Amino acid sequence: FLNQVDTKIEQLTKKEKLLQQYKKGVMQKIFNQEIRFVSDDGSEFCEWEEKNGNEIFETISNKNHNSDLPILAISQEFGAIPRDMIDYKITVTEKSVSSYKVVSIGDFIISLRSFQGGIEYSSYKGICSPAYIILRPFIEINNDFFRLYFKMDRYIQQLNSKLEGIRDGKMISYKYFSEIKLPFPCIEEQTKIANFLSSIDTKIEQTQKQLEKTKEFKKALLQQMFV
């Protein structure tokens, strides 16, 4: 029976890896425009535009808060997330919190590690360290489209090319961000792309949960065997 559980773990691990590879491959084809989506009536969408970062996003530095908003941790794994939702042990003084910036749902955040892991997205309202650069769209966009694009290898490489010759840990400035061209399909195609890629993410998450449950089941089984 233990062999069957091991086989299930192997299968789920392989499935997750294949889904990740599929997502990566299909994203490359979508953003190279080898794959194009069509509108609901079957007609073709207009050609993609290219816009500089500052034609879509402005930088926000709102420190007008009374410090009762949750402090957000900015991580490559979770994006912007309240610190108390993850194991984040750094403490801050009330005085330092007063200088923190307000982050709204739908904001994007450039961190010290964006040259490694891209730009993070916030699904939460909170406050973050003034060291971070907060980006907010001032024209209509699909947030998920850019959330996914900003984590792509090709975009991270573009961020890196802007930092050539600058030491590790250098913050990407709004000026650097603004100089990079961003793909800009019409909003309807942005939404189609985001929905399609999000559906793959859902399958990946479901597989990861199944894998975790199966591993926990095996662990419990082994504990019972050796009691």
Please report, for each region that a protein language model flagged, where it lies by residue.
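Residue "hotspots" at secondary-structure boundaries inside conserved domains
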Residues: K95-K101
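Short, charged beta-turn/beta-strand-edge "cap" motif at the junction between a beta-strand
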Residues: S114-G118
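A short glycine-rich beta-alpha junction/loop motif
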Residues: L112-R113, I127-I133, I166-E188
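Amphipathic alpha-helical coiled-coil/heptad-repeat segments
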Residues: F1-E47, P183-V227
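DNA target-recognition patches
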Residues: F57-E94
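Short, surface-exposed loop/turn microsegments at beta-strand edges and helix-strand junctions
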Residues: N64-Q76, K101-V102, I119-P130, P137-I141
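Non-catalytic DNA-recognition/assembly elements of restriction-modification systems
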Residues: S39-N64
